[in-house]
Design a protein with these regions (language model features):
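Conserved active-site alpha-helix within GNAT-family acetyltransferase domains
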Residues: 113, 137-155, 295-312
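A short, internal acetyl-CoA/4′-phosphopantetheine-binding micro-motif in the GNAT/acyltransferase core
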Residues: 71-73, 85, 98-107, 259-273
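Conserved GNAT acetyl-CoA-binding A-motif
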Residues: 123-136, 284-295
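Active-site rim helix/loop that mediates acceptor-substrate recognition in acyltransferases
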Residues: 28-74, 78-79, 83, 206-232
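Conserved catalytic-core motifs of GNAT/GCN5-like acyltransferases
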Residues: 134-135, 152-166, 309-319
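Amide-forming acyltransferase catalytic core, primarily the GNAT-like/NAT-type
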Residues: 13, 51-53, 58, 152-254
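Conserved beta-strand in the GNAT
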Residues: 67-71, 77-86, 96, 101, ...
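Conserved acetyl-CoA-binding loop-helix of GNAT-fold acetyltransferases
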Residues: 99-102, 108-121, 125, 130, ...
Length: 320
């Protein structure tokens, strides 16, 4: 039976992939203005594929046995949505609340609040170890709502994109004559790993689906890592023999190659980032799209000068 609330109008019920998937995807696209966002549209396409699989396999996992999401319905029309995505880290249940969307004509009625509260009650009953969500940094209304429900901002992440095409190295930005760029050596891994863990903390790395132990030069000894190892390359930037940065390049990914940058947080970080990525783009890049995730406030000037654009800025919020 659906749970009813006196306010707002309508009622909440469990998402049913056999009837809700198309309208929910349309709702998400409109609410988050994804039509002109290639990354967002790719995510929607993945959601369509998952919805299709759910429809085909509904007899294996009927809607009554799991809870991928909730919808809000008014007069037979779905006007709100929330998804619950589960991850497991060392057997601990970590939940991500995602795609909280309400149709424009029904915003401000408390639907998003009701959906989020219901999702939190559900996750509490499932004894989720941690509950997280991502929200656009400039979405003040949503952030205030989540703060009232017990969420706190843990960190802010910039998602950068370099579009495919011909790239020309900017001139006059920095004097790079003292830097040496080359293939990463075995001895560089310890330094790289330390800086990666600083830039990409473990408490949110589960979402990025990246395992830095596979960046290790010793990963080749693990037969299970061979596929990923063969699509990774690593480069080191040094100044007078001292490591200043390491760049890892994941290529052959579905929508865009990925870069993972290991740098010390110093006053020279912009210069080191510029030197590291400029050399990579000039000598190794194959003109395809690139995405790079990096902490807010770090290396922003370098990335902008190299032609990267800020795709989105997201706050990671955690329930406390």
């Amino acid at each position: 039976m659906p749970s009813t609330f006196p306010y707002p109008p309508g009622f909440i019920r469990q998402y049913d992939p056999t009837q809700d998937s198309d309208v929910v995807l349309q709702l998400i696209m409109e609410s988050f203005k994804l039509k002109d966002d290639p990354e967002g549209m790719h995510t929607l396409q993945r959601m369509r594929e998952v919805a299709q699989q759910q429809r085909e396999n509904i007899w294996l996992s009927p809607a009554t046995t799991n809870m991928p999401g909730l919808v809000w319905e008014i007069d037979g029309k779905v006007v709100g949505n929330i998804n619950i995505i589960s991850f497991f880290d060392k057997l601990r249940h970590i939940a991500l609340i995602a795609n909280v969307a309400v149709s424009p004509e029904h915003q401000g009625q408390g639907i998003a609040t009701a959906l989020t509260k219901h999702a939190l009650r559900y996750l509490k009953s499932k004894r989720a170890y941690q509950v997280w969500l991502q929200v656009s940094s400039d979405n003040v209304i949503a952030k205030n709502l989540y703060k009232k429900l017990g969420f706190e901002v843990v960190r802010t992440i910039n998602n950068w994109v370099l579009k495919k095409g011909i790239w020309q190295k900017p001139t006059g930005n920095y004097d790079l004559s003292n830097y040496r760029f080359g293939i990463r050596k075995f001895a560089d891994w310890g330094w790289q790993k330390e800086q990666l863990l600083q830039a990409y903390p473990t408490d949110t790395r589960w979402y990025g689906n990246v395992e830095f132990n596979k960046f290790s030069p010793w990963a080749i000894l693990n037969i299970l890592s061979w596929d990923e190892y063969s699509s990774l390359r690593h480069f080191t930037l040094k100044e007078q023999g001292v490591i200043k940065g390491v760049l890892s390049w994941q290529y052959g990914l579905p929508r865009a190659d990925a870069l993972w940058m290991a740098l010390e947080k110093t006053t020279a970080e912009n210069e080191h980032a510029y030197a590291l990525i400029a050399e990579f783009l000039e000598h190794y890049w194959k003109n395809g799209s690139i995405r790079l995730e990096y902490p807010f406030g770090r290396a922003e000037g370098a990335l902008e000068s190299l032609g990267f654009t800020l795709s989105r800025q997201l706050d990671w919020m955690k329930l406390h």
